[in-house]
Amino acid sequence: MAAKAIQYNIKVDLHEVKDLSFREAAGEKEIVPNPYIEVTVNGVTKTTIQKTQVVSATFNTSFNFTAYLTPDEFARSYVEVAVLHKYMLIGGVGLQSAVIGKYVFSFAYVYTKSQHWIYRQWVTLRNLDQPQDETGLLLITVGVFGPGDAMPVVDETVCVVNEGERTSTDVNVKLTHYSLSVNIFKGQDIPSVAGQFSTVLEPYVKVKHGGAELQTRPLPDSNPDWLASISIPACVPCFDGNVLVELWNGQDSSTAAGTLMGTVVLDYFQLIKNDLPPRWFNFYWRPPAEGLLGAVTDMMASAELREPIAYGGRILLSASAAKVQTPLPLGVRSARPIPDPATQECVWWLDLYEMTSATGYTSELRIEIAFGPHVIKTASLEANALGTYVIGDNLGRLPEMKIFAPVDEVQVWDVMMYVCSPPATTVAAGIADISNWFSGWGGSPTATQNTPEPAETPWTRLAWVRIPYDSRQFQNGKPQWYSLRSLDGSGTDMFSVLLGMEMFPTKAGKQRAPRLEYKLARFYFRALIYEGLHLPAVGYDVFPDPYIQVELASKTLRTSTIRQTLNPSYYEAYEIEIRLPENISLAPDINVEVISESNSLLSSDVVLGSVQYPIQKVPKEWTKAPVWLQLHSKAYPRCKARVLVAFELVPAEKAEDDTYPFYDDIRPSTKEGNIRLFLVGVRLFKPITQPFVTVCFGRDVENTAEPLWSQESSAPRTGEGGNWNFLEEFTVSVSLPKRMQHHSFLEVKIQDRTQGIGGESNVDVGMAYITLNPLLPWLDSRERAESLETFRLQMLEEVLIEDAENARRSADGGLAARTGGGSFDEDATKKKEMLAAERSRKMAIPYNDPDMANLKIEEVDDYVSFKVAPRPQASRLSREGTSRDERGKAPGKSLSGMPGPVARASPGAGEETEKKGDPVAEKKEGGAQAAPPVAPSAHQREALAASPEEETYGFTPEQLNFVLADLEEDDAEEMTRDEVPYELEADFTVDDLPYLRTPIFRPTDAGVPETVGYLKYVCRVFQSTDEDEGAEMDAVCKSLIETYNSTRDLVVRAYVLAARGLVPPSGASDIQTYVWIQDSENAATLPGGLSYNIRDTGYTKKQGFKPEFNRCYTLACSLPENSIVQIAVMNMGRLTDECIGRTYLDVEDRFFNKKVEQMVIEESTPIELRTLKNEGSTVSHGSLRGFFEIMRADYAQLHPPYTLASAEPDEYQLRVVIWRVKAVPLDDNSSISLFVRTIYQLEDSSEIVKDTDTHYNSTDGTAVYNWRMVFDVLIPAQIPVLKLQIWNYALLSSTEPIGEANFDLTADFFRARKRQQHYRVPRMWVRCSHPAHKGKLRGTIEIEASILPREEAEYTPVGNGRDEPNRDPFLPAVTTNRTYIDWQQIGETVGAASSAIMSGLKWTGVWMTVAGIIALVIFVMFLLK
């Protein structure tokens, strides 16, 4: 069956581009581009902002896409990323764009990766029109996530450059070039396509890989000879593992679109290892419906109606990937003809024995069997008196067919078998013939030789099955039953055919064996139907009305219908006489279907699931326990439904003489049991007004919609919204099964009384099942544990997560198989690098890293140590200054108020933790010191916690002659806080709570129910009514009532740190997020400032899909009214706000959980990751990171909330000093004029551009500036990168950059913000590069910087350039090379020339010159007189 379309979320994070190289055509000069990035997924394109005249740029932009794809569509889908150049006019007016380079990620390849994503990967951009050029690098993250896949959250500090590496190092992505060649030789048997106005036959082949798409020319022939070789430049590493070969018929036009006949997916990495020799690829398709109405029907068809059902031809192709030094150009070339793959003459024998109909079809039928282009048809078949089509020797033994088939088994066609009904014209003609015969007009007309035979009218195909070719199966000739599925898209199996096939080479000389004797004998078939379990629902809030139908050899048995349940109990036995082959191995298997009965004339029954039981396993007498059979549902593949059944098959004579008697009473043996149910309450995700609960057991035999016993609760004692406490006990004595195989349970219906126009009405809210099997006292512990797992109802969320884990395991297995034979997968290396970076992580931590959001980073030299010193105890700050032990004690009670002492974790005796390593910090180049040892792992932290004496490396203040500032206690606390990558509830066990809980669910159209709340209860089953047996339960119930009476004044603290991987349902990319947290709809503020509902719209974060909140929300809480805390991440819109995702936190469970209570006391509540979900969506919409506490109000008053680092940006001033430039190449010029440009991008994507003055006419590539630049910045910053560029100032020609570098200030910003004081970036040289001169130094810039809080900067201002105030540091004036015309140099040149002239003259010439000058003076004086 064709799978349904599945929702996928695609995340693309664009981090950075580097070394862009753009030229309009090959051989032309490179130009500095104006880059921007386009990302296209499934026809949807999203674009980043444009940068101006840069070859490297930081984007830090995220895009989300949502797609609904079938597996075939998923295999063909990809993410296409294109970096483009925007042509600009003077004044910033944009013109057309040109491609700089592209990259493609196929969905299938990304999904095979761990966690279904590729994280921060440098890829080489390529322009396939100029494959020899490497047009730049792109740092990108791509993820493809399906149902149940969690959004990955990583420690981003691993991937951030460390101190001493502020400028991004050269990225060396070494490409190995390949020439991918796909040779398309010819096609055969390609059918024409019936269009709306004409029939189209223009087949061609299209090849796609790595963003390239080429095709052969279309040829109007069903057997075209293309002889085309498609060449695509390819490389490794590559993230498009697919080479798609598509067979199309008809070109796209204004009136019609081309028809995709089929797709072949070649493995690119396998082609690198081994060439694909010429071979046939067979295509199968579903012919489109004819006419305009048919076209519309095809567009709206379900996946079932798009599944291929017919042979669509084949193509002969070969493929290879040859390593080359330089990539070859893209193109389609001629290919030499080659001989066809080897074939052999084969003999095909077919024997049909019987056909049965599961739908009671008894009209005239015919069977057609197609083997590629070869088709064989039976004569028309008539049903016998038993309603089956027994095919005798004359019609069943089909004539021998000789076929030339490929020797290679994988190239042989599959077998397609159809059941067809006669066309209407044939039926009418048959009626006319019968009428003529009766009226005397009949007779056999004599056909003349000149009368042409009329063309056969095709019969209508009703059902089909595709049988993959298997030489072992096709050579044994053993008959098998095949189920044929309906062609109407319903997915039901209409017919079953017993067919024997045999195929072997003619040269084998094998003689056809006699046809198996097919005689029917009488049997009595008995079906024992017990129960159904976890059947799928038939829609939202619609329970099924299931009955079970058993079919064998066209005989059908049907049980009664049990109304409105997922767990029906039947206990019905049926016996029927049936005729089966004497050779029982030829009999069909038993088909069991569970069907929901329709209640309307306008709808039909719905098949919930089916299973086949082998007839050969059925005994004459079933003596063992009945078996649970797993149902397979085509409409509900995620539902794990089962049926409990048994079967017997007795020869007629053995049944009729009572050798094997039939018993119709199959009810299980029982024991009397007393059920006590203490209903604590209901916890719903949505509010209701007047809830009540009905507890039911069993079903009435006469009216299965009514329970055998039921009792309605009284009004709830306390509660509001969706949380209500009943604290009421229900007692009933019933008969319960002895054996664990039979399911025994209570049904609990939750309803709400509402007032409407018509009066009072009851609205169904949800249903809960309480399984009694684990509570039965006569079962042993193993049976209880097994029955608990067997009868546990899986919710939609659990099923999705389990499916995702299975897919991950399969993907990991496939990945291991793929990487086992080659070295093209870089995951292993990348993981090693990330682990190594994690182990050696230094203190250069980004400000926006959630793991380090509340840490204070001190200078490394503060931790230099030469001996081991005792580590001080860290605890939360207390306003009263009480000790940790004092604060851990609540007056008379624990935090939850339950009786008993507060549990304390005693240190393990005799356990010591040794810390090994060199305590002396090593010096690095540039004066930077090595980082302190990395933080211990979770396992190490446990060992440290259990150690009686904790040790750390560092001086004690007494050992120093100065004051050592220790870490703040708040920060030290956060450093030791554990983190779990899941929701904390996953660690809760049944024994952690004083009550049990089961999901309250509602049916969904996926078949699997979804959770709408929880039912909390205490339940016991007793064999007697002895009061001593119930003493334990009485004590538990009494304790719960007392505790709830004292839980009116509680406090919930929700520390919401950050959100990651947000996926807005609207697909918006520019989002402003805030937190909405509530445990009640009541938004009023209580005395003392607490509230039940906080919509934090005044604290919006415009940080994209990774906002930092670092907010502590304190909510008032009373149990049970406020048991469920809803935390939603909202996107603030212009008109309405959008809920991105929400998570529900059951604080009541945490209040009663002793382990969680101890965590609060010990201040060790771990940070957890909670999945954000949205109603109507089955995929994750992101993750919320935080930790959560619940406590009594008096305890909260003694223990203030933790102080979290603010996530609001602070105003700072960045002061950058450009000292000098050196090593700038002259590029064949005698001199060069240089200036330095700095670019800083603000939050609104605008840029601050500042230039130094110009150093003119440098003859050695050096320049001096002593120039200060001042930037007002916000920390945290979205892009904390300062771009440095060296420019050539040209008076006549255009000014252009010589080299550039990105100066990453992430770690410096983080440190400056943590210190809240003046922070200096040491003086250093920054190397510059240019993509047009790969691997060459294009100059270095000597730079120094400092970062100050805005208040301090205003107190100690400095001037730009060398303006006053000129301080910190003082910048000396520069006077040389500051004018374009150097007059001093000109004077020196003239003087030198004069000296040269004078030294060459003789004394005679000198005296003559002097005399001439004197005569000239006298002449001037004479004139003046």
From Swiss-Prot:
Remaining remarks: Overexpression causes parasite lethality.
Source species: Toxoplasma gondii
Name of this protein: Ferlin 1
Subcellular location: Golgi apparatus, trans-Golgi network membrane; Endosome membrane; Cytoplasm
An individual GO BP term: regulated exocytosis
Gene Ontology cellular-component annotations: endosome membrane; trans-Golgi network membrane
CDD domains reported in the protein's UniProt record: C2, C2E_Ferlin
Topology with respect to the bilayer: Single-pass membrane protein
Transmembrane segments: 1404-1424
Family annotation (Pfam families): C2 (PF00168)
Chain positions of site Putative Ca(2+)-binding residue: D541, D545, D605
Gene3D superfamilies: C2 domain (2.60.40.150)
Disruption of the gene: reported phenotype: Attempts to generate conditional knockouts failed.
